[in-house]
Amino acid sequence: MVVMAPRTLFLLLSGALTLTETWAGSHSMRYFSAAVSRPGRGEPRFIAMGYVDDTQFVRFDSDSACPRMEPRAPWVEQEGPEYWEEETRNTKAHAQTDRMNLQTLRGYYNQSEASSHTLQWMIGCDLGSDGRLLRGYEQYAYDGKDYLALNEDLRSWTAADTAAQISKRKCEAANVAEQRRAYLEGTCVEWLHRYLENGKEMLQRADPPKTHVTHHPVFDYEATLRCWALGFYPAEIILTWQRDGEDQTQDVELVETRPAGDGTFQKWAAVVVPSGEEQRYTCHVQHEGLPEPLMLRWKQSSLPTIPIMGIVAGLVVLAAVVTGAAVAAVLWRKKSSD
């Protein structure tokens, strides 16, 4: 595996990258990339994205008519032309490096040139509530599996298998961990602070969820209660069901938090209950935008099943659109909070 030079890591001008949120809580900044080979159809596609907290602020796609790092949030549009030229130049260099890495890894694993493969990468830093570095991280995945990760001490690496051991030794010989540590402890933190200040109206807000419970008969003897949380930011939220005050884990379905397409998020949790016992069940919602946790019960005046099913269908379509736009660059976010 080719070792990346520090300047190919999206290092912005003389700044840094980090995450988002209010100073009342933690914030993070992460960059994701994915290089996907496509035998017989030209060079591998490369996509990269940057996030502050839950907000995407930059994006690059090598398949664009004019590939450049582009803004995805209004508060980053104020950066000058030198910023965007530097971002684009570094991202293109990163793309070329990862294309070479794909070839190298295919050789490590003795794989055919006819098959498609994916190399994913993530780097980022978290700030604590005091605005200081909480943790930094860098991770690689190959074909959806862990490959190489920078350890929490920012001085050593963990290799997932024998092939990754080769890359680990190369990184150690080139003192890559020292370069990453300097970036994560300095540049990343500095730029995260800058982004949080420039985008504070958007990034340091807390929009509470709009909540309700719907009822969906399954059979004559049971029904599904679905607890909805809509239009909230940031994305972190907790939905739980209780029966007579005791947490329920069986027969509970919980979907992943989904973007709503307007900068907010959506989520629901459902539980199957015996017909006639609906009032014994309560949904509990915790979110930083709420002054205190909410407790909800189903009311027979709640919206009927048909409109809710329309919302479900809309969420499914929305999730598919968002996933298609993000491609593989956001498929792998494992260990980011380890």
From Swiss-Prot:
Changing C66S: Abolishes homodimerization and homotrimerization. Decreases functional interaction with LILRB1. Does not affect homodimerization of isoform 2 and its binding to LILRB2. Pfam families: C1-set (PF07654), MHC_I (PF00129). Residues 207-298 are annotated as: Alpha-3. One of its GO terms (molecular function) is protein homodimerization activity. It comes from the Eukaryota. The gene is HLA-G. GO terms for biological process: antigen processing and presentation of endogenous peptide antigen via MHC class I via ER pathway, TAP-independent; antigen processing and presentation of endogenous peptide antigen via MHC class Ib; cellular defense response; immune response; immune response-inhibiting cell surface receptor signaling pathway; negative regulation of angiogenesis; negative regulation of dendritic cell differentiation; negative regulation of G0 to G1 transition. Residues 3-11 are annotated as: VL9 epitope. CDD domains: IgC1_MHC_Ia_HLA-G (cd21022). Residues 115-206 are annotated as: Alpha-2. Residues 299-308 are annotated as: Connecting peptide. Disulfide bonds join C125-C188, C227-C283. Forms a heterotrimer with B2M and a self-peptide (peptide-bound HLA-G-B2M). HLA-G-B2M complex interacts with components of the antigen processing machinery TAPBP and TAP1-TAP2 complex; this interaction is required for loading of high affinity peptides and heterotrimer translocation to the cell surface. Interacts with CALCR; this interaction is required for appropriate folding. Interacts with COPB1; this interaction mediates the endoplasmic reticulum (ER) retrieval of HLA-G-B2M complexes that bind low affinity peptides. A motif (ER-retrieval signal) lies at residues 334-336. Residues 333-338 are cytoplasmic. The chain crosses the membrane at residues 309-332. SMART domains: IGc1 (SM00407). This is HLA class I histocompatibility antigen, alpha chain G. Keywords: Cell membrane, Cell projection, Disulfide bond, Endoplasmic reticulum, Endosome, Glycoprotein, Immunity, Membrane, MHC I, Secreted, Signal, Transmembrane, Transmembrane helix. Residues 209-299 form the Ig-like C1-type domain. GO terms for cellular component: cis-Golgi network membrane; early endosome; early endosome membrane; ER to Golgi transport vesicle membrane; external side of plasma membrane; extracellular space; filopodium membrane; Golgi membrane. Residues 25-114 are annotated as: Alpha-1.
